[in-house]
Structures are given as structure tokens and as C-alpha cells.
């Protein structure tokens, strides 16, 4: 599954770490308008491409999922207008739900 992560702050960084551990997920890029964002630093350590602009990336037709954790309604709307029909978007609350479920599972495994 090819995933693009938009937003590399605290939430994006946490999700990136979790997603990177899953062998069925290919993170094709991490985007943040702040080139010093923590998630971009982590992505570089994982050798994942990093970007400061998402506009061209969301139009790629080989993406399965775009995860938007920017908490910016305009970004979410823009992604929705420009993404291919077969690409799904997960917004901040959906991404947080997934993160919480994964964290709970990890706690039970310990």
C-alpha cells in the first residue's frame, strides 16, 4: 500500500514511526511546509523522500492513501479536489484513531 503523509509535526511523526514498522506499507513521501519539522528529520533517517509542497504529489495516480494530519481544512479540501478518484484520504481524526488503536495493541503485546 503506497502512502503519502502530509504533516510532519508531533502527530505526523508518531504516525510515521508506526507506519514505517509495517512491511505492507510503502511511505512514498512525507510533506511539511516547515523544512525543520521533526517528522521530516525522521523520514530522512528512514530514507523516505521529503517535500515542502504537496500540490503535485497528491495528483499521482499510484497513491493508495493520503494521510493528512495538518489540521488545516484548506489543505484537506485542496487534497480532495486534486487527488485521483481511487486514492483515499485519512484526515487528522481518522489518523489519530488508527494511531490510538495501534498504541493500544502494542501495550497489550508487552
Task: Give residue ranges: language-model regions.
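Rossmann-fold NAD(P)-binding glycine/threonine-rich loop
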Residues: 39, 73-110
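Short, well-ordered alpha-helices that flank and scaffold nucleotide-derived cofactor binding pockets
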Residues: 17-21, 81
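Short acidic-hydrophobic, aromatic-tinged amphipathic segments that line or gate anion-handling sites
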Residues: 49-56, 90
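Rossmann-like NAD(P)-binding element
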Residues: 56-76
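NAD(P)-binding Rossmann-fold cofactor-contacting core
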Residues: 22-46
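Short active-site oxyanion
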Residues: 2, 26-29, 62-66
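Glycine-rich adenosine-cofactor-binding loop
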Residues: 1-17
Amino acid at each position: 500500500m503506497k502512502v503519502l503523509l502530509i504533516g510532519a509535526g508531533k502527530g505526523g511523526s508518531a504516525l510515521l514511526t508506526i507506519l514505517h514498522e509495517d512491511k505492507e506499507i510503502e511511505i512514498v513521501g512525507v510533506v511539511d511546509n516547515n523544512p525543520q519539522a521533526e517528522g521530516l528529520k525522521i523520514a530522512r533517517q528512514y530514507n523516505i523522500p521529503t517535500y515542502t509542497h504537496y500540490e503535485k504529489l497528491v495528483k499521482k495516480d499510484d497513491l493508495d492513501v493520503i494521510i493528512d494530519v495538518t489540521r488545516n481544512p484548506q489543505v484537506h479540501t485542496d487534497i480532495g479536489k486534486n487527488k485521483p478518484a481511487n486514492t483515499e484520504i485519512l484526515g487528522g481524526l481518522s489518523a489519530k484513531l488508527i494511531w490510538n488503536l495501534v498504541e493500544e495493541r502494542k501495550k497489550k503485546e508487552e
